[in-house]
From Swiss-Prot:
One of its GO terms (cellular component) is apoplast. This is Germin-like protein 1. It is found in: Secreted, Extracellular space, Apoplast. It comes from Betula pendula. Belongs to the germin family. GO terms for molecular function: metal ion binding. Signal peptide: none annotated. Oligomer (believed to be a pentamer but probably hexamer). May play a role in plant defense. Probably has no oxalate oxidase activity even if the active site is conserved. Keywords: Apoplast, Manganese, Metal-binding, Secreted.
């Protein structure tokens, strides 16, 4: 899922 991936990256940042 692209949305989940983006959320993960944002959280990691």
């Amino acid at each position: 899922i692209l949305g989940l991936n983006t959320l993960g990256v944002s959280l990691a940042r």
